[in-house]
Regions:
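Conserved beta-strand in the GNAT
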Residues: 55, 61-69, 76-81
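Active-site acidic-Proline motif in GNAT/NAT acetyltransferases
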Residues: 70, 83-89, 117-118
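A short beta-loop-alpha structural element at the N-terminal edge
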Residues: 7-20
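A conserved beta-turn-beta hairpin within the catalytic core of GNAT-like acetyltransferases
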Residues: 69-78, 87, 132-135
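Conserved beta-strand-loop-alpha-helix junction that forms the acyl-donor binding cleft
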Residues: 113-122, 144
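A short helix-loop-beta-strand connector motif used in the catalytic cores of GNAT acetyltransferases and
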Residues: 43-55, 76
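Conserved GNAT acetyl-CoA-binding A-motif
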Residues: 103-115
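Conserved acetyl-CoA-binding loop-helix of GNAT-fold acetyltransferases
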Residues: 82, 88-101, 128
Length: 159
């Protein structure tokens, strides 16, 4: 495995979609939405937020990613992940730092994210780097019923 110094943190580009999606598909418990996570929607997101999303690259391969954007008032992180074999080496922290700096430069003062309550590793990571969970109710309203969420690793559990 590449040394941490050999891991590059780079802005996510539209051309990274296939490699980023392939990474998402390896993350057990990852929630992939049929429409929001399609090539078309991720490209639209990157075009709206051209400097804020990030990938981590080792030996020419994408091994981490974060979709990061802002509505002009608050920043948001989505789909934060690092390939299992590269975890616990500071890569996630470096990627989050990159995103936070980009948001700071845009004048954004607050950033949020959603971590599933059963995502023990993810929740431990966020606490470790100083994030606080909020006691808020999260509501969503589905505008398009085709935008179903599939959780990676759960495909065969119903059979």
């Amino acid at each position: 495995l590449a040394d941490t110094q050999e891991i590059r943190i780079l802005p996510m580009r539209e051309e990274d979609y296939d490699a980023v999606r392939a990474l998402w598909m390896t993350i057990r418990g990852f929630g992939i939405r049929a429409l929001d996570d399609s090539r078309e929607d991720v490209v639209r997101f990157i075009r709206r937020n051209p400097t804020t999303s990030v990938v981590a690259e080792a030996d020419g391969r994408i091994i981490g990613s974060i979709l990061c954007g802002s509505d002009g008032r608050q920043g948001a992180l989505y789909h934060v992940c690092v390939a299992r074999e590269y975890r616990r080496r500071g890569i996630g922290t470096r990627m989050v730092g990159y995103c936070m700096e980009q948001l700071r430069q845009m004048g954004i003062n607050k950033v949020s994210l959603i971590a599933f309550s059963n995502n023990d590793a993810g929740n431990a990571f966020w606490r470790q780097i100083g994030w606080k969970s909020s006691d808020v109710n999260y509501y969503e309203f589905v505008l398009n019923e085709d935008n179903i969420t599939r959780f990676i690793g759960d495909e065969n559990e119903d059979q």
